[in-house]
């Protein structure tokens, strides 16, 4: 209940003493602001607003969508955060790789949204390099382009892990007169190779037009991981590979095995209240199509969101589920749900 008063001719709505206060905004952390994770956070923020009696607001903080987002959960800066690839979240929970000595305590998941992606090394075909072993043995200088190498830079860590699995020593490349260029955005590495500034690049976001343009406009070779190299990634980091089918890129005649860089994990901590965790899980169960329809103009295999969103697969994440989210999914299994 509110009282209405007058002040200098203006009507003022005043809450009565003791009236309940609106809850604090739900704090999301997403990506730089113009990409998919911010879009996903906006979808969930609207769901929260529309499905809380007090129309709870949200704050969407921009980030990198990588290790910084998961660390923000650990420090209590935000309540929920998206990060990609989903598999790297396990490294955060375990304090390994880019999180060595700095694990994120209590890290759990609400869901993982479907995003089919890979971290792929690509080289100029005229160099005659067909494998990472060839790259490691190449005696001349090479210009290499890949993601930023810092504690929060998943693209840099992923690129390094791929090259190291094949025995490629970036320091040795520099010693031979080569260069290593690092970028924040995956497309910059792709552009370096396409525009002749690099001989080898390692990058992701393979479903985007930039990769199609690279394959169509340059004579390049996609380097497939060997079974031994895949075993190194699995044994050292617990990371899996994914197969890119022949024909996915123009001129790709054989499948390519690459580091799996898939899915957008929606992470939180065990401190997130149960009702909030259940509400977010309910969005995954009931409202996925509201978000997915924004991508359906693209073929599913070339869409950043590999629609549809099915909670039965979305709940299978690299992290344990928040207990309340897990209960919500279990209830959905028992009761048929009308999805949007």
Regions picked out by a protein language model, each given a short descriptive name:
Residues 20-51, 55-60, 117-191, 195, ...:
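Bilobed "Venus flytrap"/periplasmic-binding protein-like clamshell domains
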Residues 205-207, 213-214, 275, 279-340:
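An extracytoplasmic/periplasmic, membrane-proximal ligand-sensing/linker region
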Residues 45-46, 60-101, 187-193, 205-216:
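Pocket-flanking alpha-helical
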């Amino acid at each position: 209940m509110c009282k209405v008063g007058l002040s200098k001719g203006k009507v003022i709505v005043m809450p009565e003493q003791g009236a309940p206060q609106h809850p604090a905004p739900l704090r999301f952390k997403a990506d730089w602001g113009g990409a998919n994770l911010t879009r996903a956070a906006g979808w969930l923020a609207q769901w929260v607003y529309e499905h809380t009696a007090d129309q709870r607001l949200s704050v969407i903080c921009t980030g990198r969508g990588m290790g910084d987002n998961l660390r923000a959960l650990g420090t209590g800066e935000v309540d929920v955060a998206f990060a990609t690839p989903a598999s790297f979240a396990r490294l955060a929970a375990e304090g390994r790789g880019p999180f060595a000595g700095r694990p994120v305590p209590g890290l759990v998941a609400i869901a993982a949204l479907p995003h089919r992606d890979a971290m792929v090394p690509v080289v100029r075909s005229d160099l005659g390099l067909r494998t990472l072993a060839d790259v490691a043995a190449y005696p001349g200088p090479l210009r290499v382009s890949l993601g930023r190498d810092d504690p929060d830079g998943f693209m840099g860590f992923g690129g390094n892990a791929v090259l190291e699995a094949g025995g490629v020593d970036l320091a040795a490349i520099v010693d031979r007169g080569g260069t290593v260029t690092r970028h924040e955005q995956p497309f910059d590495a792709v552009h370096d190779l396409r525009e002749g500034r690099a001989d080898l690049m390692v990058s992701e976001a393979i479903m985007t037009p930039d990769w199609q343009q690279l394959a169509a406009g340059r004579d390049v070779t996609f380097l497939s991981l060997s079974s031994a190299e895949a075993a190194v990634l699995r044994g050292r980091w617990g990371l899996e590979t994914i197969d890119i089918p022949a024909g996915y890129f123009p001129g790709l005649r054989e499948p390519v095995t690459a580091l799996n860089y898939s899915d957008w994990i929606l992470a939180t901590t065990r401190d997130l209240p149960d009702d909030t965790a259940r509400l977010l899980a309910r969005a995954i169960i009931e409202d996925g199509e509201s978000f997915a329809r924004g991508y359906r103009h693209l073929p599913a295999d070339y869409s950043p969101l590999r629609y549809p969103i099915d909670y039965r697969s979305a709940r299978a994440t690299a992290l344990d589920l928040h207990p309340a989210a897990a209960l919500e999914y279990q209830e959905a299994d028992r009761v048929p749900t009308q999805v949007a």
